[in-house]
Amino acid sequence: MLSSLNVLQSSFRGKTALSNSTLLQKVSFAGKEYPLEPIDEKTPILFQWFEARPERYEKGEVPILNTKEHPYLSNIINAAKIENERIIGVLVDGNFTYEQKKEFLSLENEYQNIKIIYRADVDFSMYDKKLSDIYLENIHKQESYPASERDNYLLGLLREELKNIPEGKDSLIESYAEKREHTWFDFFRNLAMLKAGSLFTETGKTGCHNISPCSGCIYLDADMIITDKLGVLYAPDGIAVHVDCNDEIKSLENGAIVVNRSNHPALLAGLDIMKSKVDAHPYYDGLGKGIKRHFNYSSLHDYNAFCDFIEFKHENIIPNTSMYTCSSW
């Protein structure tokens, strides 16, 4: 058996001519072995553009940022041209006008493998939980402690926020649907990757008949540039994510997420964390802690080694190009 790092490096090169022995490779972490699951050449690629300021676009423009500094629409179109045998989804949200929606339709008509998926058209209800239930569970948890151990300040805040939940808005999903900052992106990205293949089949998009509702998905930030076909990918237990490295300090990132099936248990673990905390964060808790929990990572382990184990990288992807420019927000 190859070491986990070597297996991942050799497998994530987009090579499609792999021997049977490669398909049987396993990698290990925390004393447990995991198969390197394949994600085939037909697995759809998903981009995301949630637009907080749709009014900034001119008439006739597709409302996805496309400037010299942030050529995100061009990157998506480039991916559709290179990966012309894959479906390229774009999950969008925002207060788009009728004319802007017509521009999205024109984009789909020009590039037949691009599918615009409106967040509001996707049924995410199976992942929802009442906000009141989350608050009540945390209130009851505090109340169960001996009086000397309770955080009375926190208890007061929880009770106050419970009372202030707007009528008709008692929903974790709805609370994020109304946000207009990065957690809006991050939360629905997690849900979209839980849906994976079913994100395409349930929304009735033409040309998606070959996608299984149980199949996986490849998410890429719009600042990632595809230079050639990705081929077959491999991921430990069917999941891998982008890893950033700054001054030799590594960190899990959500700029690329690969799953080989819908409802991946690592993402479900993250969703459970999101449903248990009143201050949960979709990036740190919903993705990072969910993956760590799934693979039994603890502070006793080497974090950089865990990042090497779970890292998705590919020689045909230039990642995180927006790091060289100012924020697109």
Swiss-Prot record:
<feature type="glycosylation site" description="N-beta-linked (GlcNAc) arginine; by autocatalysis">
    <location>
        <position position="53"/>
    </location>
</feature>
<comment type="similarity">
    <text>Belongs to the glycosyltransferase NleB family.</text>
</comment>
<feature type="binding site">
    <location>
        <begin position="48"/>
        <end position="50"/>
    </location>
    <ligand>
        <name>UDP-N-acetyl-alpha-D-glucosamine</name>
    </ligand>
</feature>
<keyword id="KW-0843">Virulence</keyword>
<feature type="short sequence motif" description="DXD motif">
    <location>
        <begin position="221"/>
        <end position="223"/>
    </location>
</feature>
<dbReference type="Pfam" id="PF24688">
    <property type="entry name" value="SseK_NleB"/>
</dbReference>
<feature type="glycosylation site" description="N-beta-linked (GlcNAc) arginine; by autocatalysis">
    <location>
        <position position="293"/>
    </location>
</feature>
<feature type="binding site">
    <location>
        <begin position="327"/>
        <end position="329"/>
    </location>
    <ligand>
        <name>UDP-N-acetyl-alpha-D-glucosamine</name>
    </ligand>
</feature>
<dbReference type="GO" id="GO:0090729">
    <property type="term" value="F:toxin activity"/>
</dbReference>
<feature type="binding site">
    <location>
        <position position="72"/>
    </location>
    <ligand>
        <name>UDP-N-acetyl-alpha-D-glucosamine</name>
    </ligand>
</feature>
<dbReference type="GO" id="GO:0030145">
    <property type="term" value="F:manganese ion binding"/>
</dbReference>
<dbReference type="GO" id="GO:0106362">
    <property type="term" value="F:protein-arginine N-acetylglucosaminyltransferase activity"/>
</dbReference>
<feature type="glycosylation site" description="N-beta-linked (GlcNAc) arginine; by autocatalysis">
    <location>
        <position position="13"/>
    </location>
</feature>
<keyword id="KW-0479">Metal-binding</keyword>
<feature type="binding site">
    <location>
        <position position="322"/>
    </location>
    <ligand>
        <name>Mn(2+)</name>
    </ligand>
</feature>
<feature type="binding site">
    <location>
        <position position="320"/>
    </location>
    <ligand>
        <name>Mn(2+)</name>
    </ligand>
</feature>
<keyword id="KW-0325">Glycoprotein</keyword>
<feature type="active site" description="Proton acceptor">
    <location>
        <position position="253"/>
    </location>
</feature>
<protein>
    <recommendedName>
        <fullName>Protein-arginine N-acetylglucosaminyltransferase NleB1</fullName>
        <ecNumber>2.4.1.-</ecNumber>
    </recommendedName>
</protein>
<comment type="function">
    <text>Protein-arginine N-acetylglucosaminyltransferase effector that disrupts TNF signaling in infected cells, including NF-kappa-B signaling, apoptosis and necroptosis. Acts by catalyzing the transfer of a single N-acetylglucosamine (GlcNAc) to a conserved arginine residue in the death domain of host proteins such as FADD: arginine GlcNAcylation prevents homotypic/heterotypic death domain interactions and assembly of the oligomeric TNF-alpha receptor complex, thereby disrupting TNF signaling.</text>
</comment>
<dbReference type="GO" id="GO:0030430">
    <property type="term" value="C:host cell cytoplasm"/>
</dbReference>
<feature type="glycosylation site" description="N-beta-linked (GlcNAc) arginine; by autocatalysis">
    <location>
        <position position="159"/>
    </location>
</feature>
<keyword id="KW-0808">Transferase</keyword>
<feature type="binding site">
    <location>
        <position position="322"/>
    </location>
    <ligand>
        <name>UDP-N-acetyl-alpha-D-glucosamine</name>
    </ligand>
</feature>
<feature type="binding site">
    <location>
        <begin position="219"/>
        <end position="222"/>
    </location>
    <ligand>
        <name>UDP-N-acetyl-alpha-D-glucosamine</name>
    </ligand>
</feature>
<keyword id="KW-0464">Manganese</keyword>
<keyword id="KW-1035">Host cytoplasm</keyword>
<keyword id="KW-0328">Glycosyltransferase</keyword>
<feature type="binding site">
    <location>
        <position position="223"/>
    </location>
    <ligand>
        <name>Mn(2+)</name>
    </ligand>
</feature>
<keyword id="KW-0964">Secreted</keyword>
<dbReference type="GO" id="GO:0005576">
    <property type="term" value="C:extracellular region"/>
</dbReference>
<dbReference type="GO" id="GO:0052038">
    <property type="term" value="P:symbiont-mediated perturbation of host intracellular transport"/>
</dbReference>
<keyword id="KW-0800">Toxin</keyword>
